[in-house]
């Protein structure tokens, strides 16, 4: 129990849209989550969020930020851009799985908005309103370096190459940022092509 004089006004906890497991239908913050016993990340994030709910401090506003794929200058994006420059741009699986994403720029803006607005609390999906397919993702990355996305890695081969991590790339995440939309939040980069 923290003394009142050192309690923060707000605590933001990072979570992931992976909590929704593989969702064929759009999911938002009000959707009932059915934990998938076969998807490890969904189990982990479900356990994290349950623990956060148990640790509520009186008078402290809690925000759970369920992050989608963050598109920015990180190691994963640099690697994918490098592969595309070398004509090794890929589409993972059959390319139809949905990816819920957000630009690094807009993610920081959302977090600032949530910290600055005292009435905002609870779960927020930190994604754009425009999810894309894995095919669009691979093509968008390749296009940003003026190359074609020539390769496709089938799901069985991806499972052989990276094992259990393959499920991170092969599951569909059609996640809607309903609470941000209800708050009339405006994304600067809602289009994947622009974000790249």
Predicted regions and their residues:
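C-terminal amphipathic/interface module of NAD(P)-dependent oxidoreductases
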Residues: 132, 167-196
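Glycine-rich "substrate-gating" loop/helix at the edge of Rossmann-like oxidoreductase active sites
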Residues: 36-41, 66-74, 94-102
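Mid/C-terminal beta-alpha module of Rossmann-like enzyme folds, strongest
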Residues: 114-164, 196
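Glycine/proline-rich active-site loop of Rossmann-fold NAD(P)-dependent oxidoreductases
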Residues: 46, 58-60, 71-79, 114-124
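Conserved beta-loop-beta element that borders a ligand/cofactor-binding pocket
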Residues: 10, 15-16, 50-73
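Catalytic helix-loop patch of NAD(P)-dependent Rossmann-fold dehydrogenases
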Residues: 24-64
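Conserved Rossmann-fold NAD(P)-dependent oxidoreductase catalytic core, especially the SDR/UDP-sugar
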Residues: 1-38
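Alpha-helical substrate-binding/gating segment
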Residues: 81-89, 96-132
